[in-house]
A protein has these predicted regions:
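Basic, Lys/Arg- and aromatic-enriched nucleic-acid-binding interface segment
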Residues: 76-78, 91, 95-158, 166
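Short, surface-exposed polybasic/aromatic micro-patch for ligand or macromolecular engagement
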Residues: 1-5, 29, 189
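N-terminal core-binding DNA-recognition domain of tyrosine site-specific recombinases/integrases
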Residues: 11, 19-94, 133-134, 228-236, ...
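DNA breakage-rejoining catalytic core of tyrosine-based enzymes
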Residues: 52, 95-97, 109-128, 179-200, ...
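Proline-centered turn/helix-capping motifs that create local helix->coil transitions or kinks
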Residues: 90-99, 165-171, 208-216
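C-terminal catalytic core of tyrosine-transesterase DNA break-rejoin enzymes
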Residues: 91, 143, 147-154, 243-245, ...
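C-terminal secondary-structure termini that scaffold catalytic or DNA-interacting sites
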Residues: 167, 180, 185-193, 197-204, ...
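Active-site/catalytic core of tyrosine-dependent DNA strand-transfer enzymes
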Residues: 175, 199-250
């Protein structure tokens, strides 16, 4: 038990107990899994380190060892997931002084990840290739994400009552726990709870599609024979999307790539970064700016060209 720990006990044992006491049942499963992963790394990097041996030097070495194979932001997350447990150990007298004080966070240089998205012509080709029948299927799912920029788990959680067809709006207030047995879950963050406008064509399509469906049931997740819900896999939808792209001879993208496509088309159309951030449910405009930096830079270059042409025409 945590209250029976001694300074000579292993830090790995303490950290496992700390997670069990303070995090089990208190945080989302996906966040708990990250703490479990941190625990695995601690067991790998300092398996025999005792609580009384946790000094600033030994902690800095732990961070350095982790940073060798991880980017700086990931190392920062690793540090934050350890720090709470360590400060509690200091408060309990299990560690003499705070070893995390003045820690230096290092990490590998992040690889430049260029996001994949379709241009307007390619997206038009993709949507024209969808077979939209009378029942909700993955082609309708692909259409909806392309038109709204929703996250995969948000779209899975949609129910008919989330649509307000008379006002052409869609309420996003929950996600679907597709990774762990199904069921509704909270959104990624508070900013993810939002109401977005949808175009009249999407209104017509989904008003017809959902008119006979149970109001509170997910549109795209079916019930199984036992009364529960069938498992849904990201790879299933990605596979269908991939086949559409290959048949059309356009770049193959994932479902998340559809979200990027939606955002990029809005930015190229001149929609403000703030509006795009709110529509995507980003916690801040900084997230949007970082994710779509290359598009923003391209738009800035276009602005410079426009300014130069305007100035040249003054004479």
């Amino acid at each position: 038990m945590l209250d029976e720990m001694k300074t000579t006990d292993l830090f790995t044992s303490y950290y496992a107990q700390w997670i069990r006491v303070y995090k089990d049942g208190a945080i989302r499963d996906v966040t708990l899994a990250k703490y479990r992963m941190t625990q695995t790394w601690v067991e790998k990097l300092i398996p025999g380190r005792k609580l009384c041996e946790m000094t600033r030097i030994t902690y800095q070495q732990l961070i350095n060892d982790y940073a060798r194979s991880h980017e700086r932001q990931t190392t920062m997350d690793f540090h934050h997931q350890l720090k709470g447990a360590i400060l509690d150990a200091v408060d309990e007298g299990l560690i003499e002084r705070d070893p995390t004080r003045k820690v230096i966070i290092k990490g590998k240089t992040p690889s430049r990840k260029k996001i994949k998205y379709l241009n307007q012509f390619e997206l038009h080709s993709l949507l024209s290739d969808l077979h939209l029948g009378k029942e909700a299927d993955w082609d309708y799912f692909i259409l909806l994400i392309a038109k709204t920029g929703m996250r995969f788990s948000e779209a899975l959680a949609l129910t008919p009552k989330d649509f307000d067809f008379s006002h052409q709006t869609l309420s996003i207030s929950k996600t679907w726990n597709y990774k762990d047995g199904g069921g509704f879950m909270p959104t990624k963050n508070r900013s993810s709870v939002r109401k977005i406008r949808i175009d009249w064509q999407t209104v017509m399509q989904f008003a017809e599609l959902t008119k006979n469906l149970p109001p509170g049931e997910p549109i795209f997740v079916r019930r199984d024979s036992g009364g529960g819900y069938e498992a849904v896999y990201n790879s299933t939808v990605n596979g269908i999307l991939d086949r559409h792209c290959k048949r059309l001879g356009i770049p193959a993208i994932s479902v998340h790539g559809l979200r990027h496509t939606h955002a990029s088309l809005l930015l190229f159309a001149g929609v403000s970064i703030g509006s795009v951030a709110r529509r995507l449910g980003h916690a801040s405009m900084t997230t949007t700016q970082k994710t779509y930096l290359h598009i923003i830079q391209e738009l800035e270059n276009q602005d410079v060209d426009l300014v130069m042409r305007s100035l040249a025409n003054l004479m």
